[in-house]
Amino acid sequence: MGSSCLPPGFRFHPTDEELIEYYLKRKVEGLEIELEVIPVIDLYSFDPWELPDKSFLPNRDMEWYFFCSRDKKYPNGFRTNRGTKAGYWKATGKDRKITSRSSSIIGYRKTLVFYKGRAPLGDRSNWIMHEYRLCDDDTSQGSQNLKGAFVLCRVAMKNEIKTNTKIRKIPSEQTIGSGESSGLSSRVTSPSRDETMPFHSFANPVSTETDSSNIWISPEFILDSSKDYPQIQDVASQCFQQDFDFPIIGNQNMEFPASTSLDQNMDEFMQNGYWTNYGYDQTGLFGYSDFS
């Protein structure tokens, strides 16, 4: 039976319990399966990429099911020979117990991964396989000799590993132009650092000028120009009548020559670059030369 014999829209997605309880058990006991969708092949004679062409199911299902007889690695042993032409299947993890609705164990599922090359230096691939087998005590008298002769294998290829890169959204705390007259937003969070800084809105600039109408002055400090204040006048007169002696700093014998006129001095300065009564050194400093 091939995939062309399947009705349109047919999909084969059985559960682990259905695979063991119905398909594998009926195959081992020699009972008829209503729809033959699982072929019997020598699975380990093919590499995994050759198996889709051996399946009765459409390739678009991306899962392929096969009955396979156990090929013992050693005549008196229990290990299965799982080597192929280009590599080998390697078991990973522990066998999983498959239970029925009544919670009784009906079989086991083994997970295998295909490695390219020869053991133990093969390269791991994306091909995986689930191998189903019945329990050792789940037998009938008529199928005693057939017990363990078949296993059911589900082969699939994992998709490429997807890296789910989550972009962390940085909450923006800007509240520019919120309708308030202050012109200040709350705070702006920097996208590169965990720092915050105050932010001034250009739409509502903060004015540095002070409105004099908003300044409150106590009436006690307001003077009436129509009245006389003798206390203030006495204090002012005492300040102006007091003599202050300021010491003369530097050379007290220093005398400045009398200048003829401001125009003459200015003409002399424009011609020479300095007044003749002052000396000019290379440091760019002026020094008076007629000290007495």
From Swiss-Prot:
Residues 6-158 form the NAC domain. Interacts with ABF2 and ABF4. Keywords: DNA-binding, Nucleus, Stress response, Transcription, Transcription regulation. The NAC domain includes a DNA binding domain and a dimerization domain. One of its GO terms (molecular function) is DNA binding. It holds the Pfam family NAM. Disruption phenotype: No visible phenotype under normal growth conditions, but mutant seedlings are hyposensitive to growth inhibition mediated by abscisic acid (ABA), and show decreased resistance to dehydration stress. Residues 171-199 are annotated as: Disordered. This is NAC domain-containing protein 96. InterPro entries: NAC-dom, NAC_dom_sf. The keyword Thylakoid does not apply. Residues 172-191 have a biased composition (Polar residues). Expressed in roots, rosettes leaves, cauline leaves and stems. The gene is NAC096. Signal peptide: none annotated. Residues 106-164 bind DNA. It comes from the Eukaryota. Transmembrane segments: none annotated. Induction: Induced by abscisic acid (ABA), dehydration and osmotic stress. Transcriptional activator involved in the positive regulation of abscisic acid (ABA) responsive genes. Acts as a positive factor of ABA-mediated responses. Involved in the transcriptional activation of ABA-inducible genes in response to dehydration and osmotic stresses. Plays a positive role in both stomatal closure and water loss under dehydration stress conditions. Acts synergistically with ABF2 to activate the dehydration stress-response factor RD29A transcription. Binds to the consensus core cis-acting elements 5'-CGTA-3' and 5'-CACG-3' at the RD29A promoter. GO terms for biological process: positive regulation of abscisic acid-activated signaling pathway; response to wounding. It is found in: Nucleus. GO terms for cellular component: nucleus.
